[in-house]
Amino acid sequence: MSKYKNSSLLNDQGGVRQPSLSNGSSVLGISNQLPPNSLFHLFSTNNQQSTTTPTTVTIQPPSSSISTPSPTTNNTVSGGGGIQTAGSSTSSASSVVGGGGGTTTPTNSNIVVIESNKEDDKECGTILMEINKGIRSGNLGEQIESILFFSHLIKFHPSPLIVNSVITRLSDIFRTTSNTVKYRILKVFQECSSEIHKVSNIEEVLKRIHSVILSNDPIARSLSLRVLGSVPHLIADKLYIHHSIRTCMQSHDQVELEATIFIMDKLCEISPLFSDSIIEKIHTVIQNVETPPITKLKYTRLFRHMHHSHSIATQSKEMLVGLLDLYPSVGFVSVILDTLTNLSLKHILYIDDHIKFLKNYGFSDSRVVVKVIALKCLQKLAITSPHSQFPIIEIFNIIKETPSKSYREIKYNALLLLSILSQSQYTKILELNQANDNDLIDILYQYSLDYDFKLSELSIQTLVNIIVESTDNNNNNNNNNNNNNNNNNNNNNNNNNNNNNNKLIESILNQTVNNICVILKTQFTTSTNNNTNINENKSTLNKTSVFLKSIIRLIKKDPKPLKSITTTIISLLNEIPYSILKSLFHCLSMCIPMNKSVLNQNGWFKLILDYLNNLIIKENSVQLINNNFNNNNNNNNNSNNNNNNIINRNNNGISNGINKQDCKYSIPMSIFMCIFKTFDENNQKIQEITEQLLPLIQYILENPKPDQLWSCYNLAQLSQRHGFHKIAMVIYSTLIHKVESECNYLWLKGLLSIATLENEISIYSITTNKNNTNNNNNNNNSKILNQLSNYHTSIVSLKASSQQERSLQFQEDFILLHEKYLFNILNLKSFLLECNDDGNNNNNNNNNNNNNNNNNNNNNNNNNNEILLKRFLSKSLIFRQLEQKYQLLLNIQSKSINHTVPLDTKQILESFIFSCNLIVKLIDLIVINKNNNNNNNINANGINHQQEQRYQQHQQSQNQELINYFPLFKFCEFIQKKLNQQHSIPSSSSSSSSTTNPISFLDQVLNGLIKIPMVYPSSFYFKF
């Protein structure tokens, strides 16, 4: 047992933790069938130390090795809390190793790195010695187990010295060992193929592996070919290996032949030399009568890599076209057409000719499989080269002329091809539609209502692509016409064309929306479909289905149809199965930010709330009846059968209302998301909706089912991300007593304190809005200021919940910045109140004083103005610094997760940056007004023009998916537009604009910023 303690293989309960290949051990993924011998013990302990050191290295004297930090070392490294940066680690290194001078710090740190590298080399040397002992063993199992550790050694220590010694040793073993060990060495080469280029004597390694090809064993030759095929870049110009591969093509052993085709496929892809030397031989083998048909097909696929030069590509194309006449069977035609398509994709000059070839050959063939293959090849070409000359009329004719009851695969692939082409060739489709009396669009209308949902969703996608792309094109044309005012005749013609296109697009839009509503009523309701059709549609309609993506894209371009689509979905709440309804509400949640009032009308919210009551309470009541029935059966085994039949009938009558398989133990997160996104802009509405939702949530918490507590935690996160902090507070207060880990308890405690604090701040902002007097505002502001200190208590809990493998630095920085943000806004509000009081007092004094004292009063006013200007500039500097800190947090977050910061996190941080920039701009307006400067253009020291231009570009961007719909950003955009309107007023009307007081306007803006609900980004919550 001491042996397992040293190797860190004890689990939390004190038992031995066996390594597992599926779950993975702490370092290696070793199969649990292998015994934990001394080799595994040595390798696991050494690698546990080496793999944990990159993030938590503790600087020690050179004699000691690098190990995981102890509690004492944590105190010395972390110091002031948080993870130390590179600068702090180097300074500590200089203090330990010796010499405190600034010039000697890099040298001392290099000494420490060299010492650590020496320790790693010693550990690797020890591991290599143990592995060599296992390889020299006479037991085959120990040999294979030892070779297994070579790949792990290279992964965890990919230094050139280790890679060179390991690969050289494996090549020696490969030459003389059995086929079983050869196969294990092949796996090592395949797993470490990206590291083999570090070998210095690669020529010796290749020669030792190549020597096995000359043996009499076909299995050994095939293993040698596959080992060489795992490193094709190293043998791209090795002619002796190329010659051996061509020799192996004559083999009659199937295993060796497949290995030969494998290495030929790898080499033809990267080696022009090998491709040029092998193309004629491949063509000869395919034409040979003795070659099996399956082997001919495998050799035919090699032609897709013959694109390294124009001559090779042309020769390959001619050979493949000749093979079509030689082998007209369906299997050969399918492979040859696919190979020709892949070859054309690599050689762009052949794309247009290949499209014509597919149209003439594929569409004229009466076989269904050939037509489907031709359409699939055209789909590949449409994705790569969407602006080529595709036969659109012929594609519509295939859809129209193909029988409806059969050959649905042809229709599906033809519609899929049209959906791809409609994103780029929408103008051509509309022109051909007008030339054919609207016949093409009518075909899409017809198939959008087809009983086959796959065909209908592709038709809807094609129509939506035409609408969206044509709308963007018309908007661009209108902008160009407005910019070019010289050519009046051309402008009139363009305007007429745009008007005609707009009318056509509007009619297509209306018909498409009507068809979407018809699909919702006919495809997914239980009254119009049998169970088989609904089950088929369940599998196709999910969150990523083409139908829902098309609806989202259409609504993001034009939010008007959202009302009719929402009306249809809500009217069918009791008829659509819950599994489909989840996906539909998820689609609505993506569309609601474009039109937040869509659920807040016609009593739709009440209908949704009633549906939630039926869904949650009835489903749980059915489950309770089932549990009670099972308990009665266990306790009363001798009960009457008639009573059991009555209970069964009652149970079935209740369960018929809701399908238990659809909503088993689940919480309708998509419905809650729709509600949260609808009312997340108003604190007063948030409190009203919260009171209506709390009974449902408390019912779930009081009667939890399996996995529902985790769903409740996700619901709390979702509510906290949309300003419903009271819901999060109720859930966290229940979950905090149900976790086992102390770390999770502290994490929930921190989230609970944050939710409680945000809920109290929102309540104070509501009372401020109702009682809009100065005294009440001051009292509420002082209450909010008193609550800000509680942010630090939540930070303490979050810090206590942090662990070595996860950092909560972003959470701490975000909370601290938000606390500073609120504090500075409230501080600025109190300062503005003082300015208003001082201004009123000065006006009263000026009215009461005599004319003799006017000069003295003017001097005093000038002095007061200078003091106020300095204080205003200091406030402006504070918000600029706060803006820079938010920008720095955004940059750090994007770098820490490989430049893939979540969209909501980026938009929330940009919202705070925008608000700080807006406050700076308003303060600068006040400063200019105090200086009696009528110039509305503010210099660079007042406004961050780069930030303003970035948000204007952000607003005008074509990609609607990146628009920021968070309430804070929308409020700042509204204020920005107001300011731009004021600046656009000409100087002659300055008297009208001067009536607006900048100080009072800034005070109103600050009140609005306080009242906006606080939202938290998704990056704030880590994954368990």
Swiss-Prot record:
Cellular component aspect of the GO annotation: chromosome; cytoplasm; INTAC complex; integrator complex; nucleus
Residue ranges with Low complexity bias: 44-77, 85-96, 473-502
Subcellular compartments: Nucleus; Chromosome; Cytoplasm
GO-annotated biological processes: RNA polymerase II transcription initiation surveillance; snRNA 3'-end processing
Highest taxon in the source lineage: Eukaryota
Main location: nucleus
Name of the molecule in the record: Integrator complex subunit 7 homolog
